[in-house]
């Protein structure tokens, strides 16, 4: 009976982790063709913001310069000039197709994120009992660990999140979140978040160590500072 009570929260935790991902993946696979067809037939204009327009314009100018340089190196003839115009036209269409596909993927990502949020909200509303059991199991597991293991785990986690090499990881993660939620890649915004978010986390961690760990387990704080030094 005790094993069954322990197994139910673990099964619940597994469903929290994998069910939103599985439903989102199934939704993406089943709705991709419909969204693509709707977007290609229902949209008569291409919607671009300033960042997207600047990016496409820069790529187009770069492409045009490369093709012109290629033609300058080769023989000048009317046929080659016609081929140059055809090449620019084809590459322009390709750029528009890529932008169109990015917009479709943005719609799909945004839809799947909304679905995942709704599912997780349902878990938090209707699964209070299971969440309480999971919380108690997690606290019991952490309580049984030695202070050395706890200090090492905290140090490892902080080095991964706010260590010397963490900005690159934060940049990739924030860029991925930007893409998933349909935002356009913005280097300035991402750089600002990368430079401020780890600092905020570091401040919160120090506050937590000072207010909570000093009161609950002073020996853990001593071991943590010894390892950190």
Swiss-Prot record:
Its main location: plastid. Keywords: Antiport, Chloroplast, Hydrogen ion transport, Ion transport, Membrane, Plastid, Plastid inner membrane, Potassium, Potassium transport, Transmembrane, Transmembrane helix, Transport. One of its GO terms (cellular component) is chloroplast inner membrane. Signal peptide: none annotated. GO terms for biological process: potassium ion transport. It is a multi-pass membrane protein. Pfam families: CemA. The chain crosses the membrane at residues 7-27, 114-134, 190-210. It catalyses: K(+)(in) + H(+)(out) = K(+)(out) + H(+)(in). GO terms for molecular function: antiporter activity; proton transmembrane transporter activity. Disulfide bonds: none annotated. It comes from the Eukaryota. InterPro entries: CemA. Belongs to the CemA family. Contributes to K(+)/H(+) antiport activity by supporting proton efflux to control proton extrusion and homeostasis in chloroplasts in a light-dependent manner to modulate photosynthesis. Prevents excessive induction of non-photochemical quenching (NPQ) under continuous-light conditions. Indirectly promotes efficient inorganic carbon uptake into chloroplasts. This is Potassium/proton antiporter CemA.
